[in-house]
Amino acid sequence: MTGPSGAGRSTAINVLEDLGFEAIDNLPMGLLMRLLDGPALRRPLALGLDARNRDFSTEGFLDLSKRLASLEGFQVTTLYLDCSADILLRRFSETRRRHPMSPGSSPLEGVEHELELLRPIREAADTLIDTTALNVHQLRREVERWFAPSGGSMLAISVESFSYKRGLPRGLDMVFDCRFLANPHWQPDLRAADGRDPAVAAYVHADPQYLPFFTRVTDLLQSLLPAFRSEGKAHLSVGFGCTGGQHRSVALTEAVAKALAEAGGQVSIRHREMERRKPDARPD
């Protein structure tokens, strides 16, 4: 990926990283082949190449693109982020930054010089995204349209259980209180188990208030996910809390995470208190 300074390359590389790419920005061209000679890639690779780097040249970029395309086992796409000169000037003016190619000359001369330098790459690129009329959110959606798996934005969802006695975990976007549900702690045969145990989960699910609560929560989350994706949100963190963080919140976390995963979500689970729990600790 390349493009003129101010066209949005840093934003685009961050979007690709959110989509699961291994993203490296400002990589000197001379290091690229050495990078590929290293350990096998486990994820798609996104590389941002900057015309300001001292080893950058148009000819070198085009030659490198051809060499990469000829490698067996690699599918290579060249992405060029374009933008009109007047908008690039406006963006640099708004940020009060000097154009990197205009030391001792006018900003317009720097912008025009860089656009002319990159013109052959623009003409040879596989994919061109014109950011002239795009804001950050629109650019994110455009990059996702081209490069997201199955054509959709990836939104990572983490679902976490916790104990209110130990405070709310940091970084939660949404919190649900489970303390109104029947507490397995008061059942001697369930006290030592946790919410992943089928007997504990069945006890929690048998509470008449459980199903309406579970249904409303999952309906709410599933109705909001498209809006979060549309806004370019990369991660959603949802927490379920109960008194001790061992029974009710764990059972809800497991059930909600399963429902979201079955609906196509990229879901991870964390049970905070169980990570902290000592062998002699008492669940709620």
From Swiss-Prot:
Q: Does the keyword ATP-binding apply?
A: yes
* GO MF annotation: an example: ATP binding
In which residues is ATP bound?
A: G3, P4, S5, G6, A7, G8, R9, S10
Signal peptide coordinates: none
Q: Which cysteines are joined by disulfide bonds?
A: none
Protein name from the UniProt record: Nucleotide-binding protein SPO0713
Q: What does it do?
A: Displays ATPase and GTPase activities.
Read off the Pfam families from this record: PapZ_C, RapZ-like_N
